[in-house]
A protein has these predicted regions:
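Alpha/beta-hydrolase active-site loop
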Residues: 141-162
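Alpha/beta-hydrolase fold nucleophile elbow
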Residues: 162-175
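An N-terminal hydrophobic leader/cap segment in hydrolases
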Residues: 16-73
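The serine-hydrolase catalytic nucleophile loop
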Residues: 103-117
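A short loop-to-beta-strand scaffold at the N-terminal edge of the catalytic core in hydrolase folds
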Residues: 71, 77-88
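Short beta-strand element of the alpha/beta-hydrolase
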Residues: 94-102
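Conserved alpha/beta-hydrolase
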Residues: 114-137
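N-terminal Sec-pathway targeting helices
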Residues: 1-18
Length: 177
């Protein structure tokens, strides 16, 4: 009888421990994949970039005025709508940079790198919004797993936009959180 109570007590503690661990795991997954996502707040991203990198404002204003800052959308194989900005070099070139943002950021927050490649190095640039950031769809940040396939797809888009003979660099940047 005493042994039976001990087994029941131990089993209850074990089941309770499993439930607590499962709940904590779900919370941590949700916390890491659906954080407060500054990458969805575009206006705040533009303000941050212009405040932090004041040299960007005249360049971006010029791009917008000349309709050189363009948007494009594609669909991933799993039917998620993805967005990117792109800017052609001021001179015809085969050099193209695909500049990818980090965790909880968006393409706008990579414009300082885009400026370097486009304005200083005369590259064509393409800046994608990864899943669940910027203007891209999705219900969770992927932390690189599906993003690697999306970036490959964006490289194909860059080839279509700028020509099949592009020399391409992919730069993935994680600025400080």
């Amino acid at each position: 009888m005493k042994r039976k109570k001990m087994i029941i007590g131990t089993s209850c503690i074990f089941v309770l421990l499993i439930i607590v661990l499962f709940g904590a795991s779900q919370y941590m997954l949700d916390y890491s994949l659906r954080p407060k996502n500054r990458g969805k707040n575009l206006e705040s991203s533009w303000q941050y970039m212009f405040k932090t990198y004041s040299y960007l404002k005249p360049w971006i204003d010029s791009l917008k005025q000349n309709q050189a800052l363009k948007d494009t959308f594609i669909y991933s194989p799993d039917h998620v709508k993805l967005h990117a900005y792109y800017v052609a070099s001021s001179r015809p070139t085969a050099k193209t940079a695909v500049i990818v943002h980090g965790y909880t950021d968006n393409a706008i927050r990579m414009m300082m790198i885009g400026y370097l490649y486009n304005k200083k190095l005369d590259f064509n640039i393409l800046l994608p919004d990864l899943r669940n950031t910027g203007l891209s769809g999705g219900n969770a940040i992927q932390m690189g797993w599906l993003d690697r396939k999306d970036v490959t797809q964006w490289m194909e888009v860059a080839n279509r936009i700028y020509g099949d003979s592009t020399s391409m660099v992919v730069q993935w940047v994680q600025p400080p959180l």
